[in-house]
């Protein structure tokens, strides 16, 4: 059971199970709204009584809900958007625009104005339709000379009629650009464009049209050139009119060079997600400057006479000839082959692809860029402080000394630790002496061959640490003439006995004493003199007693060091 309620001639059937809910909402809101209004808001709120109550409470009570007649007038003039009973712009409610679901097309269009000047009229797919394929935007501009007896309305009805028969989903024309006003608004050259959403795969196969004869005109190539020359004065305003006054302009940085046509026309929100997906999936937009609409196999012909291809132009150079039918192409540009008869010659416009996937407008003049046109590349993203070293460098060398760092990785320290350590010696001293070079041994003079010979000292650049270098006399068996000089040298290796003795070495030699240098005059008792080892006496076997000999090799005993007078 349902209840019929309404005011102002409108009849709305309310289900019986919702009568109690609507009655409760009406009591909460103060009985200021009719059942029809409450039911309309209830459907808009997706059958949520709480949201319906809140929405009705925020509505202004000083204005009555518009009647059905007023809503019909509003739908006939879609220039003015309903703003609710409050008149507030910030209240996002489509309640006043909905006439119980009958004007859903106007509500879903979000206020898009589809008004066409001239003799053309705008048409779109049905509201309750579903379309699985992406429609191609087909626009047929004037001037087109038609035979007598055939009007634009008949042609339009013939094109739209198969679409009305198919269950296709609504594809608003405002999705192609930022506003549908771009698509349908005529240019200054008085070219009216008819925008039709056509899907080739969903049209029935038994429809045939006589539209082919009306559009196949042998003199269209000349008319296209004339229309392009006339439209060139518009400076491609069709791409730049998308809500210029309402939305802020895009400000380009100084280092980015853009075309002059985009400096004042590109605004925020010019391209939505559907537009980018449409351009990226098809890779080109099918327009029809001089559309040759043909009906073959029962399909509503998609006009593909003027195919604007997106090509990758490295030099951004395009040579367009507006006065002739020839087009000069760069080596890296491609143009799809033409369809139709040979008499219909159409000049293909080649546009460079851009990062924003801009679709070519069908009634736009050819775009000509200056020679050697270049776009400055965007600056590469850098760190905030612009680190001049790579990320794997470790700039904490002074705090973490690389004692255990392997050699291949020590270069990553930004400190002296990572560089090769220089020698602390003078440049000439740290180099090894070549073989055979003379080493000046000063104060070396031949002495007596009595006792054990003291070691031969070689002066070097290091300072004395625990001992003093005291040159002493040495006995050297001179066999060469140069060794008899005052300064003598030797090229043989030094043995352990020739090292300068010092308590720092902590050596204990067996069978021979350690030779200490000569005692200094100022420091007594610190060193002891070398005691020579007496040679054993040669005694004949007759007189040699049995037992140990009376004369033995006496080992030197270290004397006590007298340090009392040295400080």
Curated annotation (Swiss-Prot):
<dbReference type="InterPro" id="IPR009060">
    <property type="entry name" value="UBA-like_sf"/>
</dbReference>
<dbReference type="GO" id="GO:0043388">
    <property type="term" value="P:positive regulation of DNA binding"/>
</dbReference>
<keyword id="KW-0143">Chaperone</keyword>
<dbReference type="InterPro" id="IPR009719">
    <property type="entry name" value="GIP1_N"/>
</dbReference>
<keyword id="KW-0539">Nucleus</keyword>
<feature type="compositionally biased region" description="Basic and acidic residues">
    <location>
        <begin position="182"/>
        <end position="191"/>
    </location>
</feature>
<comment type="similarity">
    <text>Belongs to the GIP1 family.</text>
</comment>
<comment type="function">
    <text>Plant specific protein that enhances G-box-binding factor (GBF) DNA binding activity. May function as a nuclear chaperone or lever and regulate the multimeric state of GBFs. May contribute to bZIP-mediated gene regulation. Is able to refold denatured rhodanese in vitro. Reduces DNA-binding activity of BZIP16, BZIP68 and GBF1 under non-reducing conditions through direct physical interaction. Acts as a negative co-regulator in red and blue light-mediated hypocotyl elongation.</text>
</comment>
<dbReference type="Pfam" id="PF06972">
    <property type="entry name" value="GIP1_N"/>
</dbReference>
<feature type="compositionally biased region" description="Polar residues">
    <location>
        <begin position="550"/>
        <end position="567"/>
    </location>
</feature>
<feature type="region of interest" description="Disordered">
    <location>
        <begin position="545"/>
        <end position="567"/>
    </location>
</feature>
<feature type="region of interest" description="Disordered">
    <location>
        <begin position="164"/>
        <end position="192"/>
    </location>
</feature>
<feature type="compositionally biased region" description="Polar residues">
    <location>
        <begin position="121"/>
        <end position="136"/>
    </location>
</feature>
<feature type="compositionally biased region" description="Polar residues">
    <location>
        <begin position="91"/>
        <end position="102"/>
    </location>
</feature>
<protein>
    <recommendedName>
        <fullName>GBF-interacting protein 1</fullName>
    </recommendedName>
</protein>
<comment type="subunit">
    <text>Monomer, homodimer, homooligomer. Under non-reducing conditions, predominantly present in high molecular weight forms, but predominates in low molecular weight monomers under reducing conditions. Interacts with BZIP16, BZIP68 and GBF1. Interacts with LBD18.</text>
</comment>
<dbReference type="GO" id="GO:0042802">
    <property type="term" value="F:identical protein binding"/>
</dbReference>
<dbReference type="GO" id="GO:0051082">
    <property type="term" value="F:unfolded protein binding"/>
</dbReference>
<dbReference type="InterPro" id="IPR044277">
    <property type="entry name" value="GIP1"/>
</dbReference>
<feature type="region of interest" description="Disordered">
    <location>
        <begin position="70"/>
        <end position="150"/>
    </location>
</feature>
<dbReference type="GO" id="GO:0005634">
    <property type="term" value="C:nucleus"/>
</dbReference>
């Amino acid at each position: 059971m349902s209840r019929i309620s309404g005011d102002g001639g409108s009849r709305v059937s309310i289900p019986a199970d919702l009568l109690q809910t609507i009655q409760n909402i009406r009591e909460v809101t103060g009985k200021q709204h009719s059942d029809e209004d409450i039911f309309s808001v209830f459907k808009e709120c997706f059958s949520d009584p709480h949201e319906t109550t809140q929405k009705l409470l925020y509505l202004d009570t000083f204005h009555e809900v518009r009647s059905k007649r007023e809503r019909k007038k509003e739908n006939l003039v879609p220039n003015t958007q309903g703003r609710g009973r409050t008149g507030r712009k910030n209240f996002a409610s489509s309640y006043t625009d909905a006439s119980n679901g009958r004007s859903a097309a106007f509500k879903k269009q979000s206020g898009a104005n589809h008004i066409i000047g001239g003799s053309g009229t705008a048409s779109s797919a049905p509201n309750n339709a579903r379309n699985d394929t992406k429609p191609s935007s087909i626009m047929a501009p004037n001037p087109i000379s038609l035979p007598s007896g055939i009007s634009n309305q008949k042609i339009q009805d013939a094109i739209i009629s198969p679409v009305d028969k198919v269950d296709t989903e609504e594809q608003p024309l405002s999705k192609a650009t930022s506003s549908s006003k771009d698509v349908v608004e005529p240019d200054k050259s008085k070219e009216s464009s008819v925008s039709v959403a056509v899907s080739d795969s969903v049209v029935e196969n038994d429809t045939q049209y006589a539209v082919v004869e009306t559009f196949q005109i042998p003199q269209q190539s000349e008319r296209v050139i004339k229309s392009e020359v006339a439209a060139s004065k518009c400076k491609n305003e069709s791409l730049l009119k998308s809500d210029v006054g309402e939305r802020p302009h895009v400000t380009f940085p100084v280092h980015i060079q853009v075309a002059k046509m985009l400096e004042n026309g590109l605004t925020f929100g010019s391209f939505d997600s559907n537009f980018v997906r449409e351009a990226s999936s098809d890779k080109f937009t099918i327009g029809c400057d001089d559309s040759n609409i043909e009906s073959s196999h029962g399909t509503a012909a998609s006009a593909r006479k003027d195919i604007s291809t997106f090509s990758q132009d490295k030099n951004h150079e395009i040579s367009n000839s507006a006065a002739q039918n020839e087009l000069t192409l760069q080596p890296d540009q491609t143009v799809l082959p033409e369809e139709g008869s040979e008499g219909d010659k159409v000049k293909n416009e080649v546009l460079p692809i851009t990062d924003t996937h801009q679709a070519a407008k069908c009634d736009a003049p050819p775009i000509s860029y200056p020679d050697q046109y270049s776009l400055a590349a965007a600056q590469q993203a850098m760190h905030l402080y612009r680190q001049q070293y790579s990320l794997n460098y470790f700039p904490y060398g002074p705090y973490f000394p690389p004692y255990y760092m392997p050699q291949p990785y020590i270069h990553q320290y930004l400190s002296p630790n990572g560089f090769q350590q220089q020698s602390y010696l003078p440049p000439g001293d740290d180099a090894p002496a070549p073989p055979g070079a003379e080493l000046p041994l000063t104060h070396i003079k031949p002495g007596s061959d009595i006792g054990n010979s003291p070691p031969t000292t070689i002066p070097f650049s290091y300072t004395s640490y625990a001992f003093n270098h005291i040159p002493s006399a040495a006995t050297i068996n001179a066999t060469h003439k140069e060794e008899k000089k005052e300064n003598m040298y030797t090229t043989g290796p030094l043995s352990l006995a020739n090292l300068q003795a010092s308590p720092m070495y902590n050596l204990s030699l067996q069978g021979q004493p350690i030779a200490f240098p000569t005692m200094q005059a100022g420091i007594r008792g610190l060193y002891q003199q070398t005691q020579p080892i007496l040679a054993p006496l040669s005694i004949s076997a007759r007189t040699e007693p049995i037992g140990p000999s009376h004369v033995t090799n006496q080992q030197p005993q270290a004397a006590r060091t007298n340090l009392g007078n040295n400080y």
